[in-house]
Amino acid sequence: MTQIKPEVKRTEELRQLLQQASYAYYVLDTPIMEDSVYDQLYRELQQLEIQYPELTAPDSPTQRVGERPATQFTSVRHNIPLYSLENAFNIDELQGWDQRWRRQVPKIDSVEYVTELKIDGSALALTYQDGILVRGTTRGDGVMGEDITQNVRTIRSIPLRLNFEGLEILERVEVRGEAFLPLEVFKQINEERQKAGEQLFANPRNAAAGTLRQLDSRIVAKRRLAFFGYTLHIPGRDDTSIANTQWEALELLEKMGFQVNPNHKLCASIAEVAKYYEYWDTERLNLPYMTDGVVVKLNSFKLQEQLGFTQKFPRWAIALKYPAEEAPTRVENIAVNVGRTGALTPLAEMRPVQLAGTTVSRATLHNSDRIAQLDIRIGDTVIVRKAGEIIPEVVRVLKELRPAETEPFVMPTHCPVCDQAVVRESGEAVTRCVNASCAAILKGSIEHWVSRDALDIKGLGEKLVHQLVDKVLVHSVADLYELTAEKLCALERMGQKSAEKLVDAIAQSKNQPWSRVLYGLGIRHVGSVNAQLLTQKYFTVEQLATAKQSDIEGIYGIGAEIAQSVYQWFRIDANQRLIERLQAEGLQLTAPEETKAFGDGNQIFAGKTFVVTGTLPTLKRDEAKALIQKAGGKVTDSVSKKTDYLVVGEDAGSKLEKALSLGITQLSEAQLLEMLNE
């Protein structure tokens, strides 16, 4: 019987534990573990996935910006994704971030940074129509959030009407900020809960999150949440039309009636940012609310737009957290892993050491630059730290304790899996195997293809993928669709019934939408969110494959790095052949509106009344109306109690406000097209 590798077993255990804890906390509002325990398990999982990149699954808690919305509230799509921030844990990492973004914008003279205290609460997105608060939503997973407008209205520091005195009157404004519980209020709430025999809240952040998701807004009102605004957007317009910088945006928020954290500061250099961070390390303990770090943003909106986003983070901002526990240990070996993108990641295998109640024995060394910077060698005594209290990281080498016989570590010149020469491209820190036939890359690409957020092929797990590659049954993801039950039965522990079931599951994956196929291709930097953004713009693979790089970069949320990666991917002959094979196999490389919406006249909207308002991302309003009518729906010009759906674009106007007051369901263009495809 084949033994499951300890790291595989532990990774799966951690995912299940964290998913159970997230469900209990976010959906049931009944935490089953302490926040610190969740953080510890999360960081352990994160470290395992860093050490074993091939174990990273799209449905892992580490791949989420937040949690999926519960069903008790209406799910709504954020007009602009609500991203989380990349973390740094010391000044060196802050400087590293500063150097990274500067490499993307080399011709820049001076730059300003805005530093803000990182409030430990819950992120909210607020929508104002003609100055009136019409919607408040949670972060959710960054793309979809929950409509908690009734609860948001109870927070006294959130204005129900914006103050436009002396300002341009804006038709639509979106404000982002943090809802939190002041420490004194938190203390009073727990005292009351103790008297009532109720379970106490673990900390102010949990209390704030649980309060916001109360179905009874009267309870929310009693808990006296507070709110600090920290940014704003003007849908349908360039944000620079009202503010050119983050500093100006904060000033504008104050003028509009929002409470803004008074401790923000404009800094002229990273050195000044570092001083701000060091000052608040101790001073924050005197604040009337919880804060766990400092948020650093580039002040210029123009520069922010140039830098764009990764799948999860803006490149122009970072959260600088406060330091964690450190301890000495000995490096016993330096191993090198190969991920699905071919990246070679060095890992320090260390004598086990206790940090924050857990045993640490491995730590990522990131790349050869980091190894050279540390001058780390096998046999060295090092200081290992748990960044963010959990992620193990080697922070320095105690060279005075170095044994005489040690030698500098050199990254391999050939892939440790396929033995082909590796490359390091100019300007990159990562060494890569570029052999498309490398077993490690192929296994990783297939595991990614079959994962839940991609083609979601049930029954095709890691062990089976490895068998398929090792026995040379597949050379690419397209080969999966040529597998037969007879071929599969030759594999270890694969019977006829299981083989037939797997063949059927593979065939069913041909029905997955274009956005999932694009994500499954594993193009560098293209996550599931980016794939959705791309397929909302480009309805067919041909449109995307022939798009200009500058046009791809113009999509909100798709920065230069992603655009370049997508553009270059479609110019590789092997990738073009893969697309041709997938098309021949019948996979969906076309968005629903190109295939079914104009197709068989399915009357799925029969008896339903629609109103279309605002500017849609890709469809003209008449085109949207035609699609609805072809599916049996009725389209009217005004919102009433008889309206079933409001299809909303940018600059929706008063129709949206009326629809919200009547409780009418709103649909984005993407949601409309998804319904047409069902």
Curated annotation (Swiss-Prot):
Membrane-spanning parts: none
Annotated binding of NAD(+), by residue: D35, S36, V37, Y38, D39, S84, L85, E116, R139, E178, K297, K321
Cross-referenced SUPFAM superfamilies: BRCT domain, DNA ligase/mRNA capping enzyme, catalytic domain, Nucleic acid-binding proteins, RuvA domain 2-like
Record keywords: DNA damage, DNA repair, DNA replication, Ligase, Magnesium, Manganese, Metal-binding, NAD, Zinc
Cellular component terms (Gene Ontology): cytosol
InterPro entries according to UniProt: BRCT_dom, BRCT_dom_sf, DisA/LigA_HHH, DNA_ligase, DNA_ligase_AS, DNA_ligase_CS, DNAligase_adenylation, DNAligase_N
Ranges of residues in domain BRCT: 600-678
HAMAP family, alphabetized: DNA_ligase_A
Family: Belongs to the NAD-dependent DNA ligase family. LigA subfamily.
Protein name listed in UniProt: DNA ligase
Phylogenetic placement of the source organism: Bacteria, Bacillati, Cyanobacteriota, Cyanophyceae, Nostocales
